[in-house]
């Protein structure tokens, strides 16, 4: 279904106001909200009794103050998504494919089926808990089941465990997995895959891991990530350990001491973190407000997963920005409705300004597939850093906006710091697609410089 939206002439304004001591009190002022400059209309009312003609439609302003909090935004987004899905017949969603890879001369590690059934059930429960807390209900990732248990696609490698496979073996393992799945009639290029590699050795309490451990190119239609298995990896290992088991673990460096709990937090937490990449989530960092909930899963959350079970910290959490992206991913949404259609996004208006110690990004969009939210990743460039994203984005905070009835958004970016920044604007669409536009600015003395931003905005706007 195409959403027909009137084409308006693009408005380009990038400005920097003077720094003020506090944000403006009224967030719905016509002078600050683009939604109030382009009003939507209500259906026609009763006829004029004297002329028999319908009166002029009443103009209604979108009240941004009603979506000022995270729960209010979630309610708005969920409602808009339900409306879109109700307009078309539901198409079955996708399920995460979990693959277990092992070398030719080695069997899978002991109890791998039972252990990974429980690990994935817990990861599924984590997502369910987080989506519920954020106001999206009982939403979680879908897993393939076989006789009531997790379905694992077992793939035997073509090489022996003689050094042929290592951390750098992601691409050759990917090719072997794709060939094996093709024999079962599965097009891996159209799936989201979690590849668990039985590439570790355990000698008592000494563990050596030499598995690929990262995600590769992903979008809402496909994705792939690699994680490691170990005999010591188990959900029970996340709980308080009365035996105080200490492991010696070697992965990239020499052997390092790990408690059993820390080992499982790191590697089960690493599994859900890398799975996030396989689901197309980049890194991000908790805002000051969000940090009250713990550590962002896609930041350093792989090192804090389920710490709350042991009362060692607040644990990991899912940011609202990433919950929005998962909400429409076919592995979560339960539908592939229009998943192969390009959103054909156009930014008709875009304005970046500095008001009340926050960067305000306002704009108006047009798209063939409804846009349910806009997200800004505010990514600071550290000293000596080359480029942004891909392991340089752990400090990127995320900020969200709903889309008004007149297809406008208003993102307010806070927690500002000095230095050079990349501001990535992501449009999230109802079919799971996400479109990225990049802006850059520098911050010095508490004031942003939008000189480069101004040039970039002029290239983004579609008249």
Residue ranges, per PLM feature:
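Active-site scaffold of zinc-dependent metalloenzymes
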Residues: 207-261, 303
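Propeptide-to-catalytic entry region of secreted or membrane-anchored zinc metalloproteases
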Residues: 50-218, 383, 387-402, 429-433, ...
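C-terminal motif of bacterial Sec signal peptides marking the signal peptidase cleavage site
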Residues: 14-15
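Short, low-complexity, disordered segments immediately C-terminal to signal peptides
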Residues: 20-46
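Sec-dependent signal peptide recognition
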Residues: 1-9
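Short beta-strand elements
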Residues: 431-463
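Active-site recognition of the HExxH zinc-binding catalytic motif
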Residues: 266-282
């Amino acid at each position: 279904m195409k959403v027909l939206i009137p084409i308006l002439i693009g408005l380009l304004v990038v400005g920097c106001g003077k720094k003020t001591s506090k944000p403006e009190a009224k967030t719905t002022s016509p002078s600050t909200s683009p939604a109030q400059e382009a009003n939507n209309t209500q259906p026609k009312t009763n006829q004029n009794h004297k002329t028999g003609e319908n009166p002029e439609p009443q103009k209604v302003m979108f009240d941004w103050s009603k979506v000022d909090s995270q729960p209010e935004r979630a309610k708005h987004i969920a409602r808009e998504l339900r409306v879109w899905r109700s307009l078309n017949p539901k198409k079955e969603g996708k399920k995460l494919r979990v693959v277990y890879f092992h070398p030719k001369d080695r069997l899978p590690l002991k109890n791998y089926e039972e252990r990974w059934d429980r690990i994935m059930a817990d990861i599924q429960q984590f997502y369910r808990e987080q989506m519920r807390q954020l106001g999206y209900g009982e939403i979680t990732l879908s897993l393939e089941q076989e006789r009531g248990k997790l379905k694992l696609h077992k793939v035997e490698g073509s090489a022996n465990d003689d050094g042929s496979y290592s951390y750098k073996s992601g691409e050759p393992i990917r090719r072997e997995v794709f060939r094996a799945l093709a024999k079962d009639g599965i097009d891996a290029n159209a799936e989201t895959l979690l590849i668990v590699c039985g590439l570790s050795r355990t000698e008592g309490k000494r563990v050596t891991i030499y598995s690929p451990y990262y995600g590769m190119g992903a979008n809402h239609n496909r994705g792939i990530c690699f994680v490691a298995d170990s005999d010591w990896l188990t959900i029970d290992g996340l709980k308080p350990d009365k035996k105080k088991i200490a492991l010696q673990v070697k992965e990239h460096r020499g052997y390092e001491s790990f408690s059993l709990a820390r080992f499982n937090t790191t590697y089960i937490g690493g599994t859900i973190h890398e799975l996030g990449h396989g689901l197309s989530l980049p890194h991000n960092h908790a805002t000051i407000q969000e940090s009250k909930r713990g550590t962002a899963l896609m930041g350093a959350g792989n090192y804090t997963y389920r710490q709350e079970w042991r009362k060692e910290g607040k644990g990991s959490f899912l940011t609202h920005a990433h919950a929005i992206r998962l909400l429409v991913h076919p592995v979560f949404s339960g539908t592939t409705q229009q998943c192969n259609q390009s959103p054909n996004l156009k930014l008709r208006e875009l304005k970046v300004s500095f008001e009340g110690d926050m960067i305000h990004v306002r704009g108006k969009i047009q798209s063939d597939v409804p846009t349910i939210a806009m997200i800004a990743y505010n990514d600071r460039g550290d000293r000596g850093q080359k480029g942004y994203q891909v392991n340089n984005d752990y400090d990127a905070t995320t900020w969200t906006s709903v889309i008004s009835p007149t297809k406008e958004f208003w993102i307010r970016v806070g927690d500002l710091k000095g230095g050079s920044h990349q501001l990535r604007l992501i449009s999230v669409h109802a079919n799971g697609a996400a479109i990225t536009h990049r802006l850059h600015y520098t911050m010095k003395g508490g004031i942003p410089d939008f000189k480069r931003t101004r040039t970039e905005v002029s290239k983004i706007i579609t008249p």
